[in-house]
A protein has these predicted regions:
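A short pre-motif secondary-structure segment
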Residues: 205-208, 248
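Alpha4 helix (beta4-alpha4-beta5 surface) of REC/receiver domains from two-component response regulators
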Residues: 62, 75, 85-101
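Hydrophobic framework residues that shape the active-site pocket
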Residues: 174, 193, 208, 213, ...
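Short regulatory alpha-helical coupling segments
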Residues: 130-131, 144-163, 194-201, 218
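Conserved nucleotide-binding and Mg2+-coordinating catalytic segments in signaling enzymes
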Residues: 130-149, 169-183, 191
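Two-component/phosphorelay signaling modules centered on CheY-like receiver
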Residues: 8-29
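Catalytic-core segments of nucleotide cyclases and related cyclic-nucleotide turnover enzymes
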Residues: 226, 258-300
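Active-site-proximal alpha-helical element of nucleotidyl cyclase-like catalytic domains
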Residues: 185-205, 212
Length: 300
């Protein structure tokens, strides 16, 4: 686990770090609780926070509460408070402030390791629940809701002057695959195309529904996104699947758009969708960009 430990005493920090590091944990220690909170905020790899109640400038209870707000639906974070004054009031206040557990200070090695094993079990279950809630069960890509959220977060990180581009993809004449070869083969085709989306490094890939997919590309220009869509289009034409009536070959159409200042992810998707429609109605197996005046006018 990646563990942050907060205590005003460097001696206590050294003792706890000495207990945890030999067990394979990554440990960062802080005497300043505000610095600790900033570190936890900026490092999603942190899965456990151990804090004394007697910390400054942010008190231990406030630190628990603030850290708990970071542990949203996408980030497991197990919080353990510790105090040399163990009593019912301190325990209740800590748990009410978002702590998951309470331990004496200084903790005994056996108890500390046991409680961290419990923390590992809990965060492991939380990660699995998050995975199930965000993943499309057929393809392993993000589902629509999770994709929109992740793409929105990427756009927020990019800021007003950042770059993010969007690719929408749709398997051409997919209904005929299901009709001629059955839904099992259709599912295999969907999984095959989905795997191609994962070949674009740094992309956020999702299945929006049916045979439609989306790929958000943070930091990519329109030209770079067009090139990526071109590579994906070519790879899709090279896919072969075993069907009930012989080999199955498919193609896909692609719509591409890029970020405009003040635009939402919804607007980015809308323009990519209009470009995708243009690709499908002008021959299929094409890449069309939303940069043309015609498509921009339709998006407006």
């Amino acid at each position: 686990m990646h563990i942050v430990v907060v205590d005003p005493s460097r001696v206590v920090l050294k003792v706890i770090s000495g207990l945890l590091t030999p067990r394979g944990h990554t440990v960062d220690t802080f005497t300043d609780s505000r610095e600790a909170l900033d570190f936890v905020t900026d490092n999603a790899s942190v899965t456990a926070l151990i804090t004394s109640l007697e910390v400054r400038p942010i008190g231990g209870l406030e630190l628990c509460w603030s850290a708990r707000l970071l542990a949203d639906a996408h980030r497991p974070l197990y919080i353990i408070t510790m105090s040399s004054a163990r009593n019912a009031r301190n325990l209740a206040e800590a748990l009410d402030s978002g702590s998951d557990d309470f331990i004496d200070k200084p903790p005994s090695p056996e108890e500390l390791h046991a409680r961290l094993r419990a923390a590992e079990r809990m965060t492991g279950m939380q990660r699995e629940l998050i995975r199930l809630a965000e993943t499309d069960s057929l393809t392993g890509l993000l589902n629509r809701r999770a994709f929109l959220q992740r793409a929105g977060e990427a756009a927020d990180r990019a800021g007003a002057h950042g770059r993010i581009s969007m690719i929408l993809a749709d398997i051409n004449q997919f209904k005929s695959v299901n009709d001629q070869h059955g839904h099992d083969v259709g599912d295999t085709v969907i999984r095959g195309v989905a795997q191609e989306l994962l070949t674009e490094a740094g992309g956020i890939a999702g299945r929006l529904g049916g045979e439609e997919f989306a790929l958000a590309l943070p930091g990519r220009t329109l030209e770079e996104a067009e090139a990526a869509a071109g590579r994906l289009r070519l790879r899709c034409t090279q896919l072969r699947f075993k069907g009930q009536r012989g080999p199955v070959q498919v193609t896909a159409s692609f719509g591409v758009s890029t970020w405009s200042e003040g635009e939402t992810v919804g607007g980015l998707l809308k323009r990519a969708d209009i470009a995708l429609y243009e690709a499908k109605t002008t021959g299929r197996n094409r890449v069309v960009s939303a940069a043309t005046d015609l498509i921009l006018a339709r998006a407006g």
